[in-house]
Amino acid sequence: MESLTQYIPDEFSMLRFGKKFAEILLKLHTEKAIMVYLNGDLGAGKTTLTRGMLQGIGHQGNVKSPTYTLVEEYNIAGKMIYHFDLYRLADPEELEFMGIRDYFNTDSICLIEWSEKGQGILPEADILVNIDYYDDARNIELIAQTNLGKNIISAFSN
C-alpha cells in the first residue's frame, strides 16, 4: 500500500498542502468521482484542509463544514467538488434518500468527512487522508486504496 506522510506545523502549511493536493486532483480525468476520505478527530483540520484545497484552486467564498447540510457543492475550473460531512448521520440509509450515488457517477471530486458513518453505501476510497494533531501541528498521511490513489501519491513527488 503506497502512502505519503507530511508534517504540517501550522494552518498556513495546511492550506498550502491543500492547494497542492487539489491541483493534483484537478489534473486527473476519470469516468467516476475521485473518492477522498478525510479522517481525523473533531478539530483535527479536515475542513481546514478542504478550505485550502478549494481556495487554492480559485474558490473565492467561505468554506464551511457541511455538518448540518450534509454536502456543500462547488463548481471550480469546470469540475464539481462535493464536500460531505457525515458526522450527524444516524443511519447510512439516509444517504440513499438523498440520492448519494448520483454524486459518484461523474468526473467529480468527493471529499468525505466521517466516512465510516456511510459504511455499506459509500464506494471505496481512492485515497485516505488521516490527520493527527499535536498541539498546533498536524501529521497528514495519504494512503492509496486504488491505482488512482497511487497515481495521486506519485504526483506529490513530481
From Swiss-Prot:
<dbReference type="GO" id="GO:0046872">
    <property type="term" value="F:metal ion binding"/>
</dbReference>
<dbReference type="GO" id="GO:0002949">
    <property type="term" value="P:tRNA threonylcarbamoyladenosine modification"/>
</dbReference>
<keyword id="KW-0460">Magnesium</keyword>
<keyword id="KW-0479">Metal-binding</keyword>
<comment type="similarity">
    <text>Belongs to the TsaE family.</text>
</comment>
<dbReference type="GO" id="GO:0005737">
    <property type="term" value="C:cytoplasm"/>
</dbReference>
<feature type="binding site">
    <location>
        <position position="136"/>
    </location>
    <ligand>
        <name>ATP</name>
    </ligand>
</feature>
<dbReference type="InterPro" id="IPR003442">
    <property type="entry name" value="T6A_TsaE"/>
</dbReference>
<dbReference type="InterPro" id="IPR027417">
    <property type="entry name" value="P-loop_NTPase"/>
</dbReference>
<keyword id="KW-0067">ATP-binding</keyword>
<comment type="function">
    <text>Required for the formation of a threonylcarbamoyl group on adenosine at position 37 (t(6)A37) in tRNAs that read codons beginning with adenine. Is involved in the transfer of the threonylcarbamoyl moiety of threonylcarbamoyl-AMP (TC-AMP) to the N6 group of A37, together with TsaD and TsaB. TsaE seems to play an indirect role in the t(6)A biosynthesis pathway, possibly in regulating the core enzymatic function of TsaD. Displays ATPase activity in vitro.</text>
</comment>
<feature type="binding site">
    <location>
        <begin position="43"/>
        <end position="48"/>
    </location>
    <ligand>
        <name>ATP</name>
    </ligand>
</feature>
<dbReference type="GO" id="GO:0005524">
    <property type="term" value="F:ATP binding"/>
</dbReference>
<keyword id="KW-0547">Nucleotide-binding</keyword>
<protein>
    <recommendedName>
        <fullName>tRNA threonylcarbamoyladenosine biosynthesis protein TsaE</fullName>
    </recommendedName>
</protein>
<feature type="binding site">
    <location>
        <position position="11"/>
    </location>
    <ligand>
        <name>ATP</name>
    </ligand>
</feature>
<dbReference type="Pfam" id="PF02367">
    <property type="entry name" value="TsaE"/>
</dbReference>
<feature type="binding site">
    <location>
        <position position="47"/>
    </location>
    <ligand>
        <name>Mg(2+)</name>
    </ligand>
</feature>
<feature type="binding site">
    <location>
        <position position="113"/>
    </location>
    <ligand>
        <name>Mg(2+)</name>
    </ligand>
</feature>
<keyword id="KW-0963">Cytoplasm</keyword>
<keyword id="KW-0819">tRNA processing</keyword>
